């Protein structure tokens, strides 16, 4: 039974005994303060307390007594130290000054950061063993899947490894990029997906490392994607053959999705800035200008499809912040930030769209009064929300941080609670792909899920927004919510041989139904945002210096002279 592959050896990560003992130190010190050190009863109680925890407790007891006599010993700050870390020498009795012991919150932070590193290593072990150089790992069947045949998972994960300080894994992946990665292939790629994952990943890794290998590869793939823009309307084709230099729409339609053609701008603009070749930015800026002028919007909201021949919106009357439209709104704000807040049309479109969301798409559940973003279909609100929409709290918070209206942050807080509940109200603690909200029955559940929508693809949008919310508020509840999600990933999606798998039913903790696929964005986005959420270091990819593309690849905010 494939589902049983997820059960063994996949517990919620426990606190190591030494960490548990260390976190008891404040109570033990109070006992010493309130009672004579030589009191037999107190010593007996302490010895018993440590004995029942673990043998490690005896070591902590010795440290505790030593600290009482004046020598400060720094507690070990991690559940699994990085291989490059060096243990400090024990202080001599004469060296009485030193750092204060870590408080419980700091211990919690270290534990969580190390848990993300361990999760990445486990996922990478599966990819390295069963799918090396291929696009995606199929962890249950211990094989791989191909989409473009370009090592998507490896490229998507490069900057994550750098940020997590996994230098050994990074160097091995870099060698593959240097010796094996070639874009001279007769293969069709999706313009949007290859831009955000491959071009974005290479540009980000170049900026983090300074290694021109990644910039050279970025130039190569960027130039090969340019035939997509050879259309009558300048709205790009969805697919490009990077070997032949040809492009075409999907086989079933002449339309492209609005999100796909308006969520490639950060990457191509940055490529022009680095190469001093204006063709890339010129192509994507023309798309932005044309969409800015188009008829068919509703209070700043855009339809989901656009025709590559006419350059006009199609399937009008349906408006969503979910699939096919989501990152259009995200990139309005982020392009404005990337360019130094100088492009007024981008800000105008973004602010108008947020007002459109508030006027047309917001609903409230009957039981718990959760605020959600629904879909507008020909004037009627549908209480349906994709997990993808959970990018919005983070985007709203980012805008508010950069001087946009304070009520954007108020809405972000409300929507963040709703996205949290999409996880918390499921039996596995993991969100489904799509939910329906209860508007009528106050005695019912806030959230319902159709059987076809109960899958979880290891998506990043909620933990992405948790990262932004914590960075800007320092409210630890957002870290706690992220930790709950991390634990649920470990419990229900972790495969013992290596990797994590999408699951088919978040409502069934007994048989969640492994789907045997680890999307590249689990390493490129989900684990990266979890690590940044738990890191507590605002300078680790500073949001005042970088803007993340929609695949979580940080690109620099341009200097004022750009």
Residue ranges and their predicted role:
Residues 36-39:
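Compositionally biased, intrinsically disordered low-complexity segments enriched in Pro/Arg/Gln/His
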Residues 28-29, 41-49:
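N-terminal secretory signal peptides that target proteins for export/translocation
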Residues 1-21, 34, 44, 50-54, ...:
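Glycan-recognition and catalytic cores of secretory/periplasmic carbohydrate-active enzymes
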Residues 23-25:
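Compositionally biased intrinsically disordered regions enriched in polar/charged residues
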């Amino acid at each position: 039974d494939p589902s049983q592959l997820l059960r063994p050896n996949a517990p919620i990560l426990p606190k190591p005994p030494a960490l548990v003992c260390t976190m008891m130190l404040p109570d033990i010190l109070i006992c010493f303060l309130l009672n004579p050190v030589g009191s037999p009863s107190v010593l007996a109680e302490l010895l018993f307390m440590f004995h029942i925890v673990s043998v490690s407790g005896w070591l902590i007891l010795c440290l505790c007594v030593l600290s009482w006599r004046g020598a400060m010993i720094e507690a070990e700050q991690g559940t699994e130290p990085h291989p490059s870390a060096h243990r400090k020498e024990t202080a001599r009795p004469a060296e009485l000054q030193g750092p204060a012991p870590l408080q419980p919150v700091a211990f919690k932070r270290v534990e969580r950061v190390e848990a993300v590193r361990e999760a990445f290593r486990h996922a990478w072990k599966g990819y390295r063993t069963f799918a090396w150089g291929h696009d995606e790992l199929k962890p249950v069947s211990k094989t791989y899947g191909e989409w473009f045949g370009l090592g998507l998972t490896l490229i998507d994960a490069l900057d994550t490894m750098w940020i997590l300080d996994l230098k050994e894994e990074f160097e091995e992946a870099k060698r593959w990029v240097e010796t094996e990665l070639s874009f001279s292939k007769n293969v069709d790629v999706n313009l949007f997906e290859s831009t955000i994952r491959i071009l974005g990943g290479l540009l980000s890794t170049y900026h983090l490392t300074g290694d021109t290998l990644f910039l050279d590869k970025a130039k190569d793939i960027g130039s090969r994607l340019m035939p997509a823009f050879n259309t009558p309307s300048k709205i790009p084709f969805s697919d490009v053959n990077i070997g032949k230099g040809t492009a075409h729409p999907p086989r079933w339609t002449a339309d492209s999705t609005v999100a796909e053609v308006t969520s490639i701008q950060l990457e191509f603009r940055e490529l022009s800035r680095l190469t001093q070749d204006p063709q890339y930015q010129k192509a994507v800026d023309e798309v932005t200008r044309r969409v800015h002028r188009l008829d068919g919007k509703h209070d700043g909201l855009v339809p989901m499809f656009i025709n590559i021949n006419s350059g006009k919106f199609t399937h009008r009357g349906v408006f969503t912040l979910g699939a096919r439209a989501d990152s259009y709104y995200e990139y309005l704000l982020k392009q404005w930030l990337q360019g130094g807040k100088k492009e007024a049309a981008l800000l105008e479109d973004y602010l108008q769209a947020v007002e459109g969301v508030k006027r047309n798409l917001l609903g409230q559940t009957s039981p718990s009064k959760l605020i959600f973003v629904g879909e507008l279909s020909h004037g009627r609100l549908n209480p349906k929300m994709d997990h993808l929409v959970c990018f919005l709290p983070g985007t709203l918070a980012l805008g508010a941080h950069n001087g946009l209206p304070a009520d954007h942050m108020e809405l972000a807080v409300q929507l963040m609670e709703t996205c949290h509940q999409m996880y918390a109200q499921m039996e596995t603690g993991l969100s489904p792909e799509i939910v329906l909200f209860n508007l009528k029955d106050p005695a019912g559940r806030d959230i319902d899920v159709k059987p076809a929508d109960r899958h979880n693809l290891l998506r990043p949008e909620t933990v992405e927004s948790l990262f932004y919310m914590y960075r800007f508020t320092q409210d630890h509840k957002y870290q706690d919510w992220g930790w709950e999600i991390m634990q649920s990933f470990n419990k229900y999606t972790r495969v013992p041989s290596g990797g994590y798998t999408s699951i088919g039913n978040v409502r069934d903790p007994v048989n969640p139904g492994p789907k045997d696929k680890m999307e590249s964005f689990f390493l490129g986005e989900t684990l990266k945002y979890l690590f940044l959420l738990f890191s507590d270091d605002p300078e680790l990819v500073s949001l005042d210096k970088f803007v993340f593309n929609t695949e979580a690849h940080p690109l620099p905010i341009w200097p004022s002279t750009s």
